[in-house]
């Protein structure tokens, strides 16, 4: 969605550190704090593996003896929307393929032998999070809750906000009472209004997942290595950075959908500080701004009371390359912002501050906000 040619985790967050750098340093800090051999293992795709491993090479202490630093997702062909045949894209054949969503983690852990290796090494539980969520730090309090809960599977949940209206939500299935996770792409058009109703569906998934290794191994073995998660049909361009390239379908599954598979699965409400996802350049702008500070423990601490609502014009800011061109001196100050909406083509100088509710609107030529400008609703 951001036109990335490499792994999103390689994007710079601040002080020259990428998502990967911060995650690696978080884990190294926790190992020292708890004197525990906490493994860090990445699920990479065929597209992200080489770049990820190159970026991690500087952290020589990161690997744990007997365990890999990565395992690979499967890959599948992208299908043309017009006839459902595999797409051909000679200018970059790699773009003919895609990973089948993060729900592939379960069969990938089995196929790679990782699940067995973790069990043989004496590990009992696994915590999984998205690499673009720097709030998902391994937390001893949540780990303790999960260990004593007896649940085979759990997801951290947060109260939904305006930013989560288009995201998935939890519900309870009437047929058997089990918790299910419904994603936007799985919701029919006539039910979209109900999906966005935050009084009806109050909680969103963080994609911070906990599971018991024994329960996962037994369930996968009973199901012949496949959990049977609901399929998600995503329509995209074969080249994410070229909106004129052919439309394709990518069939995916969601990692959190596994909650419906396990009897006794649970959700646990956590603070918003454990959910700092970067799905769009709107999110990236907030993360790079002074709304957050990077602590000595390498945790991104929110220093403003509330997160501002940011909406950048997709015609000019959707892709990271174009986004960076328009913020050449870094993100503006958003600590005192309530909302920040940008329509049109604007470039921002150094030291710009946004205060209150600000909306920029330009239907003409590109414009520039000079350095040191204070944008306010006053």
Model-derived regions, located:
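Domain-scale recognition of functional cores that engage charged ligands
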Residues: 4-256
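Catalytic nucleophile-elbow at a beta strand-turn-alpha helix junction centered on a G-D-S/GDSL motif
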Residues: 1
């Amino acid at each position: 969605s951001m036109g990335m040619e490499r792994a999103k985790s390689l994007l710079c967050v601040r002080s020259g550190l990428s998502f990967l750098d911060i995650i690696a340093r978080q884990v190294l800090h926790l190992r020292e704090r708890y004197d525990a051999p906490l493994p860090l293992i990445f699920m990479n795709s065929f597209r992200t593996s080489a770049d990820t491993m190159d970026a991690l090479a500087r952290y020589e202490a990161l690997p744990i003896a007997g365990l890999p630093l990565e395992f690979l997702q499967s890959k599948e062909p992208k299908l043309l929307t017009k006839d459902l045949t595999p797409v051909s894209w000679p200018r970059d054949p790699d773009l003919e393929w895609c990973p089948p969503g993060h729900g592939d983690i379960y069969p990938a852990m089995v196929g790679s032998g990782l699940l067995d290796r973790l069990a043989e090494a004496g590990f009992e539980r696994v915590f999984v999070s998205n690499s673009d969520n720097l709030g998902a730090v391994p937390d001893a309090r949540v780990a303790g809750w999960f260990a004593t809960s007896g649940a085979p599977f759990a997801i951290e949940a947060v109260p939904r906000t305006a930013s989560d209206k288009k995201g998935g939500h939890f519900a309870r299935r009437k047929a058997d009472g089990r918790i299910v996770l419904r994603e936007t792409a799985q919701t029919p058009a006539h039910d979209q209004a109900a999906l966005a109703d935050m009084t009806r569906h109050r909680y969103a998934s963080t994609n911070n997942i906990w599971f018991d290794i024994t329960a996962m191994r037994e369930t996968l073995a009973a199901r012949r290595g496949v959990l049977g998660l609901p399929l998600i049909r995503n329509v995209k361009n074969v080249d994410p950075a070229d909106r004129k390239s052919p439309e394709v379908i990518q069939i995916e599954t969601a990692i959190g959908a596994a909650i419906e598979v396990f009897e006794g699965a649970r959700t646990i409400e956590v603070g918003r500080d454990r959910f700092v996802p970067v799905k769009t350049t709107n999110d990236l702008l907030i993360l790079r701004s002074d709304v957050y500070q990077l602590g000595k423990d390498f945790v991104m601490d929110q220093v403003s009371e509330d997160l501002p609502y940011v909406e950048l014009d997709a015609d000019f800011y959707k892709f990271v390359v174009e986004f960076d061109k328009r913020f050449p001196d870094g993100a503006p100050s958003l600590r005192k912002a309530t909302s920040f909406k940008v329509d049109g083509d604007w470039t921002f100088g150094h030291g710009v501050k946004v205060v209150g509710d600000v909306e920029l609107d330009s239907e003409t030529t590109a414009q520039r906000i000079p350095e040191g400008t204070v944008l306010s609703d006053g």
